[in-house]
């Protein structure tokens, strides 16, 4: 039901598509790789599918790096592999995952009627940069090339050194980890080293998106959140997501506060050793849309000097309503 609900938010329904839209978690063992890794596949596809055509965005992953990351291979291995495929995938070390994706995909391509795949690459503004149909025999090699290109299009914060990052919304519709690990510079995976860049001392998040349907995966990546966000968390969905990946710390609940003001004042209290005029802060709507942001006075001169950024307005203090909610926002303005 949860899978169908998410598809519905994207307009993918039986009425809109003119075909049945089915969610299924039942899988069967399809075979194994040369290393003995078991390969699972969707039972309904095994029994009824004449052809299989995976469709997915090709982009960098939030938990591992390699020749293939998020894309068609992962859709075949983890998506159509169901809980069995996902569980086995996430039980191995991060360094092994790209190799695993390629090996398991080869087994699937050899045993299932995969016609090919449809790869989607987006630019830094979540606009479609390219859609490419790839025949099965070229699927892996072409995905490797598309991933390298997609990384050159990735958005990034205007600076990689911050005292504080304020995020208006987190959610699965922005990143599989709620807040993109590549943007905030945090992995929080036990036994794995953290990223060297960007370096952000504290991350605060105001809200959880409605489109996330209570799945707050990634909330453990941040330091401060609001009661509003915590009240929206579906613990069952969040825990299932993180127990499947085994990255359980990403589901830990951070310090939370009744209002935006209280949360941000706490973050500033933790930064009290930094002179106010030197505090480096950025406010963004989410970790996907980074075209517009608010920056503190300490950052502004270095951005202006690059000539790559346009200043849209004068410096001003952050504004709050009577309930302590932030009204100075990049997204839709709050009126109450």
Predicted feature locations:
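An acidic, phosphate/nucleotide-engaging active-site surface
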Residues: 2-67
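Short acidic, glycine/serine/threonine-rich loops at helix termini
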Residues: 2-5, 33-35, 63-68, 129-133, ...
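General beta-strand structural signal in soluble alpha/beta enzymes
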Residues: 17-24, 31-32, 54-55, 116-120, ...
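Gly/Ser/Thr-rich loops at beta-strand to alpha-helix junctions
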Residues: 1, 59-61, 171-173, 285-289
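Conserved, well-structured core segments that form the ligand-binding/active-site neighborhood
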Residues: 41-171, 185, 189
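C-terminal non-catalytic interaction/assembly regions of soluble proteins
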Residues: 182-186, 191-336
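Active-site rim loops that border cofactor/substrate pockets in soluble metabolic enzymes
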Residues: 19-32, 163-167, 171-175, 247-258
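Short coil/turn connectors at secondary-structure junctions
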Residues: 15-19, 47-51, 111-115, 160-163, ...
